[in-house]
Structures are given as structure tokens and as C-alpha cells.
Amino acid sequence: MEMFASKSLQVEGLLFGVCSPEEILATSVVEVTKSCLKAETGSVYDPRMGSAGVDDDDALCPTCENTGRECPGHFGHIELAKPVVLFYKETVAWLKRCCHVCGTVGNEPRPFFFAPYSACNACGAQRPLVRLVDAHDPCAIRVTVRRKDGEPETMPPELILATLDRVRDSDVDRVLGRGKGSHVRFHPRRLVMTRMPVLPPCCRPNARQWPDGAMQDDNLSVFVSQIVKVNQRIKALEPDNPAVEGLVAQLRLKTLCFVDNTKGKVMHATNRKPMAGIKERIGKKGGLLRQNIMGKRRNQTGRSVVGPDGTLEVDEVGVPEAIADNLTVPVMVTPFNVSSLEAMMRDGRVSSVEMRDGTVHRPSEWRPSHGDHMETADGSPLGRVTRPSYDARDPSVVLRSWKTGETVTRPPPFSWPKLEPGMTVTRCLVDGDPVALNRQPTLHRNSMLGMRVKRLPGKTIRLNLSVTSGFNMDFDGDEGNLYLPQGPQARSETMLLMNPKSVIMSARGPHAEVSLVQDGVLGCHLMSLNSEIPCPPEELATCLMEVHGCEGWDVRDVEKGATPRDLLSSVLPSTLTVDCGGGCRIESGKIVSGHLTKSAVKKIVRAVCLENGGDAAGKLVDKLQFLTNAWLSHRPFSVGYSDCLTERPEETVRMVADAVCSKILEAEAADDEDGVSVALCGARDRGQAVTCAALTPDNRMAVMSRAQSKGDMFNLTQIAGLLGQQYVGGSRPGKEIDGGRRSLPHYPRVWDLEQTTLKYESRGFVRSSFLKGLNPREVFFHAKSGREGMISTSQMTGVTGYAERKMVKLNEDLVSAYDGTVRDAMGNVVQFVYGGHGMDPQRCWSDGCPVNFKTLAEECSSQECSSQISGLRSPAVTSVEEASLLVPVGLCPGAPDPVRESLFLKHASVILKGAEEHPCEDHSAWRERVARSYAAAVLCPGEAVGVLCAQSIGAKQTQQTLDTFHKAGVWLDDAGSVPFGELLGLSQKPMRRQCVVPLKVDPSTPGDEVRDLVGCSFVRRDLLDLLAVRPSTATVGKTASLELDPVKCFELRISPADVAYAVAEKFPPPHFDVSVSSFGVTLSWSVNYPVDNLFTGLFSVQVGGTPGVESYRLLRGRDGGWVAVTKGTNLGAFLCHPLADWERVRTDDVWDVYETLGLAAAKKRLYELMFSCVGDNLYPAHIKLLTDRMMRRGRPTPIDRYTMRTCEVGPLSRAAFEESLDILTGAGCTAETEHCAGAGARVAAGLPVRAGTGYMGLLCGKGFFDEPVVKVPDADGREYVDYSYSDDESFEW
């Protein structure tokens, strides 16, 4: 949004409806009666409807007398020879709702569909059965009615129009529920079209073909031409002509396909391709809403390949000079910049100058015509003009027109006006201009950042490596987009809000998004290791100059003979004290122990950002980057073939082989497939430990792995140790050939005792390394498992991207309000307290706690007190009441009082706990710091928390999917896109439905005895699944024997008596007489009793105690007790089971929890399941907001297109997601009003979104805009205007 007011009017709302024939005629300027595709009167391109071509932009419109560029276009109309039904579903709904004789609608406030064959309360007429037949075929779609004891009859559009015309306006107002007068915008008679509007030609412009430049008519123009042609043919025929029926069918087909041709019923006459109707133009990714309204192409943009540049600062972007000279920005002339602008004007870097009266001066290049004659001043010929731009440069050359022979007069040379304050100069980019850098796909906030321009030679866009993680750039040909903001407000927001220093802290999780990578991390690691050998003087001077430059530095900070670790410590803030983990600790800006890694550097940047702000963190990243670059230039580091070798290769190979053999023996002794997988995974882990221990300390690949700059120990193990077990689909490669007996034809069917290693190789165990080389069979298994990661990367990225888009569209209106609540566009409360704490997670050390109490206690204690025993210190606060005084009083004022009391108690408990665990000496300073930190961490009003939630979760899902590509052969866990997609959709039949049931049995009890105790009470199976052979109906003896499968029945502890009881309960005598045999059940029945039908339902008899559970596994829990993991869920049954520990029973089915325990329990369980999928390194506030959004309506609501259709926002916001035409049609048929409250609707209407800087408003008093009359003399005697109000003035809003 620009700072200055626009001359155009703002859209306040949109009224949807269906036009009546009278309204169509009133807005029409011409009746289209000719089917020719030429600019003729009455044709499809009648000039009175506006311009349609690309070459007549300067022609005047006969209707509005504007040029082709300014003419908005004017509608025409077609008088249809026969009525046409466009919206069949809505038409059938109204036919079911009203009486077909008198048109009366029921008296209910929201009438339902009357029962067919019932009598009308007004006239007593019978209501017929109305059906829509062949709804998906536009050639055969029709409405049928059936009277009682009659046959279905097709209801023609003429009869439909007559029936719906009887509906009274008052009934329409009552049915729509939009208040009195709604029938003005919609009446059911308008569902049958008798007069068709014709779009202006500017809405269906001609397209120029390439390469011949011929004009091609738009599909909609061809549709209109065909409709007009058929319509005129019908009018020309007599009503009783036999050809009329076929032409009417064509007219209705082409009219329907004009709106919706997704079935491709109407095709081009030349290329036989389906033509695009209105629905195809509006919906999908390339439609009008998403391609041209929600997102638009714009000027002042650039695109090029992106590359790294370690000399740039974090917030700088290197722009190629060719792009910088092409992009322009308007600048207001002031006394302070007039000299610099005049210099740019002389250098040719100004494109235009706008005077204060609005006149624009722009240089235009004059060129002679191609073929003009060139002569010297004395008349000597020089030939003809072949290169107009080059030949016009010499002013001494005389030009004569090749047409008339007359001398061509050159225009006078262009001269710029003298610059004065108030003018606007459009200049090229200079260093320091703000520009937005973006890389698609824009998954989260850090995919588009505001940078400072730095003009550089070359043709690639360059940026600092520290910001590449947010863009997900790997410089393998990635391209970046540059967007140049034009207005002063847009430039300020780009410079301040979008700056990388303002978004160093990730909006996704508690880590720094902008930090060192690769060479920078490696340099920090190596420098932190070197704490004894001093730097040479040249190296020391180079590093200090690179970091501090000409600003200078205090020589006392870096002593003579400083080591690389001292150099690294000199860059850190002197007040920094942080425990980086892994034995690395920094105290008072000095590295006192350990060494730096990538995670340690991120923790340092995060600590500096939280304590000193984003600017300080950005400067720290710059200094670390420049310091490591300079230091590595003196200490080269490269990896070679020798780094792939261990210190003693033969011994390493032997030790790895021994480890593999021992684990293979464990796999042989395993009872099930899970035990085999655990043993084989242990072989890879043992091989990794052996390989890493055999590497030399200075091995460069190991150094990079320990520094976390590139690679890890897993890669080293695959290179020098072994690849280990390969997995496909979460399990070992199966035996897929030779009837399921072999995995490859190279392996035998039966294994000898000496072929144990080969046996596991046939199931994908690779004991070779890349250094040794894989045999062809191992290569096959490795490629087979690696394919899974590749396919997952290529296919699941689209799945996760669509999931993110669904979350964004349904949560884009969720914004934090000024009262601390989270509300949607309609003002409905989604959360009373954001995240349960009301704090901005990016400003907190932990979830909802913005204070690092340990560091704060050290800072608020003297050095003498710190060195003494901790008993000399005392807690700064001693009670909850005292701690609650440090919480901001205005925290979440819109929440109910009980919620606020709980919130204050929660924060006070955290403060009290921090004070007790970390006592200090200066209590007043401690309290002041805590109060200031809490006040600064309160969530800002207008924060788009819904979009942040969706982007954070979506980016995390996408990153998890991309990571699978780099883990070829590893057992990929299923806590990823598929389960999370099921949670978003709240599938009632998820792929994995299980219950975890802890058992109340002695942990020392053997597993078989536990199964005996449980019996078949945990399962219920169909009788057919338990049979060894399916019997047929006996014809002799009237008996049947059901033979049970002993393996299945023993595993489930289902006895023949249980089967007999279940059969007898469903089919008691005289149906069957049931008796138990050795391991089966015998059925007998009466001789004259028919049992053929009974046998059909016999095999569906349920045997067991818990419906919905097929089987279960017994596992050991973390506490050593027995846990039953079931396949299938029935939470209610397990909560009541005497052997189940009901307090710890868990199920993965959210709907089962909702139906058993209610909404609160389902919400908590949904949060736990989502946290297990994506909660790692993610702010819990995002998941809490998403679960609250899904549970806000009082029942679980999925995140999908059906929920979007029932949202309370306007139809335009809903149509911007999916099913655009259906939603807009429904809005018109229900006379909805779009108030432009949702984010999507405001973007489509050209309004600022109510979030961020567009969230606040301005309240002014009545006299605010009055001319000030009070003049007060200043100290020098000059008068100035006093804009303040006096105390006795009345101030009214």
C-alpha cells in the first residue's frame, strides 16, 4: 500500500447475484446477431463493445469515447430462441422446494426439500419426485419429474421457467435469509436464461500467433460465434420443423460448455482440441483468480542465476550492472540529493523527470527510416541506412527520405530540465537501494528477504552464504527474483521488516535461520581447536584488517602472539556467556572450553540475537564470515583420496567383518523380522564405530563431519566401512521371483549352513563399502532402496506443497488482535492466548519464557560473589504474588478473567522457579531485566500467526521429504508426509490405526502366559479369516464342518469353543446346532430347513471380544512392563478392560478419542500426534494454533476443500482456493455479499491485507483536519503553528 492516497475508489464490498433479463438488457449496448468474427455491426466484435485487437489501442470507442487502453469494455447480449438452464443443481433444489402448481414455499425459516408425493399446504397439489439425470454429461443432462403411479418425464426448460416464475418474492427473501429485498439480486426464475450476456472483447482479446504474427480468436469468442450461429438458425426455422429439436440441443450444449467445458465436449474445428470455457479460465493455478488477480506480473523486476559471494554482508545482494541499469526507482528531489541526482543525470542513469505540475520529461531516441539515403554535407552519397541506431549517431550526415527524397529533419538534442525540490526523478539502482530477493517456491518467510543493492560486474545475482538456508539455494543453477519496491512506504518496509537482520531468528523453531555454513563453520571449528600456536604476524594483520577494516580496533583486545582461538574470541561480544553443548562453553566473550561446530555457532548467533538484537547478530555473522575467509586463505583445507583411507585399512576391514559376523549370528537367533532388522541395523552401527575409530585425528573428512560443515559419520562409514542393510518400503527387500522363494535368480532356493552371509545378502545386506566396491547384486539392492528416496523426493514434495497451501488458505486470516487474542477475519476468537503464553516465540529462550535466568543471575552478581559459595546469593523474588508483578499488566486483556489468572500464574511460576534455581545479588537489576524482557516479548498486534503456522509446518514437512534423498538405503520412518496428511484431513479410516494398551500384569510373566491371560478379549475377527478351508453347503447329511486355522487361532488365542459360541449367538436353534470337534466346529440343521441364505452370512460372524481390532503384538515398554499394540482401535473397550492400565491407554485415531472422551481429549491427542510428526525443532505454538483451528467449531474439522467451502469468510476468499466457479455460482444463487474481510478477498479487490503494517487504523477527532489558527513565537521571535489542542477544547470522535 502506498503512503499517499490513490485517485481511484476503494472497494468496500461485492454483491453477488444472478442477472435478470432486464438487467442484461440494461447493461447491453448491442444485440449480437451475426456470427462472423469481424469488427462489424451486430457481430461478435461489434465496435460498440470496445476494442479487441492489439493494434487498435489508440482507436476511440463509440460508446464511451475512450481509447482502447482506457475503455473498460461494454457488454452485449443475445436473445435466445429457446430458454437454457445453466445451473442445474440449483434449479433442481428449487424445484424440490416449491410447489409446481402455485409456487408456494414452506413456512419454515430454512425450508428443506419437501418429501415427494406430499400435498402442498396452500393448494393441495401433489409434489412430484424431481431428479437430476446424467449430471456429468452436458449432452444428456436433464431434469425429470415423476408423479405418483406415473412414469418419469423430462421437464423442459420452458416448463421449469414457468414453474419457478410462480415463486413469490417474499418466499425468496425468506429462503435466502439475507433480509428483505434479496430477491432483487436473485430469483429462481433467473436460473433459466432467456437472454445471454456477451462479454466485452477486452475480456476475450485476440492473441497474436508466433512466428507469422497472425491473429487468433479467443476460445470464448468462438463459443459466442457458434451460439449466435445456432441461435439464428433456430429463429429462421418454423417451430414445427423437425430440425429445431436438434438445433435446440446444440444451443443448450454450446451454452453449457461456454460456462464449463471440462468434459471437452466442444472442440476446435481445426486442431480438434477442447476449447476453454469460463470455468477453465477462472479455476486452477493458471486461472484468472490465482494467476492474474491473486498474483500478478509486474514491472521493475529482474531474474538471473544466483551465486555465492563471501565478500558481501548478510543484508547485501550483488546485482549485475545490466539489471541495475534496467531497474528504476522514483526519487523525490530535495536540497540534500539534488547534486547527486544531477550527476546521475549527466551520466545517463536517469530515465525520466516528473515536474511538479505532473509533466514528464523522458528522452526518446530518434532513428531514421530503414532505407533512407545518406549524404555528406557537400552532397556526396554515403549509401543507404541499414542500421538506423548506428547510422543516426553522426550529426554531420545528411539524410533524405527514400519515399519523397526530401531532407529528413533531425529533432533538436534532448536536454534535461533543471532540477528543483519537489520534482520526481526516476533513476537507476545505486548501492544501498532496498530490493526484495525471492526464490521460488516461497515456502516460508525467509524465502523472500529485503536486501541492500551492491552493483557488481557479471551476470549473476550474488549473496552471502549465511542467508542461503532460508532460500534453500544450493547454487546448482538456482535462479532468484528481484523485486524493486517503488513507494516510500514499501521501500521502508523492505529495508526494515524484511531485512535479514530482522529475521535472524527462525519463525519455525528455536534456532537461528541466518548463520554460517560450510567454509565459515569449518573455519570456526579449526580456529577454535588451535589454542596454543600463535598466528604469524602477516596472518594476524590480514585477519584483523578483514574483520575491522579501517575502523580500527583496540590493540588490547588482541594481544601480541594471539592464537586463532583468541582471534575468534575477539569477534564475540564481551558480555556473551552461553553453553553451546558438546563441551563448548563461552564466558564473557571468550571460548573457555570445547570447540565450535555448526550447532554451536547457531546457538551463539541465537544468544546474541536474543540479548543484543538482530543488528548485533548480523554484524557478528559478518565478522565471523570475513574472519574465517581470511584465516582459511592462509590455511588451505582440501579433501583428497587419502582422507577416505583409515590408518590401518587391513585391520579395519577385519574388525568390520568381525562386527558384521557377530550381528549376523544375532539375526539368526532372532525370533521375528523385527529382531532381524534390529540386529542388522546394529551391524551398521558397529561398523560405523569401528570405521570412525580407525580414522586419524587429522583426517579432513572426519574434521568436516565433526565440524558439521559437510557430511557426517554415516557418509564416512559408507565410504570406508560398509553400507549395511538396505530397506525398501520400511522392510528388507522381499522374495519377489520364483513363486516368492528368491529375491534374485543368483541365489539358491535352499541355504546351506556355510551360506549364512550370502543368505542375508539376498535380502539386501551390503557388507561392502564404496571404497572396496560393490558386487552387481549389492549394487542392485542399493539402487532399489535409493530409488525409494528419489521417488519420495520427487513425488512427495508436491504432496507437502499442497498440504502447506491448504493450511495457508484456511489460516491466512488468523491474526493477533490488540487484546491479545487470535481472531479470524470475521472477528471470531480462535485462541484467547496465543500459544498458551501470549509471547512471541522468536523472542523467547524456551517456550513462553523470554529470560535466560542462568545468564541473568551471573550478570546481576558481582565477580567476588560469583567466585564464592552460592549461599551468599538469594532469590530475587520469593513468592508467586511478587513474581506476577513482573508480568506485563496488559498481557492478553481480551481473554476471560479465569484464563488471564491462569496465564499470570503460569508466568509467575516460571519466574519464581528461575529465581529460586539461579539466585543473584542485585535484586533490583534482576527484576528490571525480567520485566523488560517480558514486556518486549509480548506478541505484537497484527502478527499473521496463521500464515506463520502454516508456513512453518509446511516448510518442516518439505524439508523432511527432501532429506530422504540423502539417506539412500536407510530405514525411512513413516512419521512424515503421509501420517501428517491423514491428520490434516482427519481421516476416519487412516492407514495405521493402533492402540497402545499397557497391561496390568507382572513384568516377569512370560509373553505366552500374558497372551493366555488376555485370551481373545483384545481382538475380533471374521469367521472366514479363521478358517483353514472355506466349506461349501452340504447336500448330504445336512451337516458342515468348519476347520479352523491352528496357527492363526493360537496366535489370537481363539478356541473352537469361542467360535461355537459366536455362531450359536448369531444363529441359534433351529438355524444351527453347533458342536465342538477336535479343532473345528460342526454345524447341523433340520432336514427341511433352508440354509443356503444362512451360509452367506455365516462367514461374517465376528469372533472375539473387542470389535474393530484385528490383532495385537506384545512389546516391552520403557519401564519394562508388557504393552499390547493393536492393529485397529476401540478406545472405549480398552478403557473398560480389567487387564488394561486405562490411564496410559493411547490411540492414533482422533475420531475414536472424540467419540469416546469428547472434544478436549481429541484436541489434546491431535496435538500429541502432530507433535510426534513435525514437532521436532518446531515451536509448539504453531501446532497449538493449528489444532485450535481444527477444533474451533465444536467437533474435529479437517483442513481440506470441503472445510474451505463452509468457512465464514466471503465467497471471493473461498473461491481463491479451489472449486472457484462452483463457489461463485453458489454465492450468486444465494445472494451473498463479500465484505472484503478475508485476506484473499482483499488481495483480489486491491486492498491492503489486515495484517502487519496494514492492521492498524487511524482515529481522528472532528477538528483534526481544521486549519490551525494558533501561532506561537519561538525563542528567536519567529512564529510557528501550534497544532496541539488546548485543555478546554472538547474532543469528540
From Swiss-Prot:
Region (Bridging helix) location: 776-788
GO cellular component, one term: DNA-directed RNA polymerase complex
GO term, biological process aspect, one: DNA-templated transcription
Chain residue ranges for the region called Alpha-amanitin binding: 724-734
DNA-binding span(s): 270-339
Top EC class for this record: transferase
Coiled-coil annotated spans: none
Entry keyword annotation includes ATP-binding: no
Recorded family membership: Belongs to the RNA polymerase beta' chain family.
Name used for this protein in its record: Putative DNA-directed RNA polymerase 008R
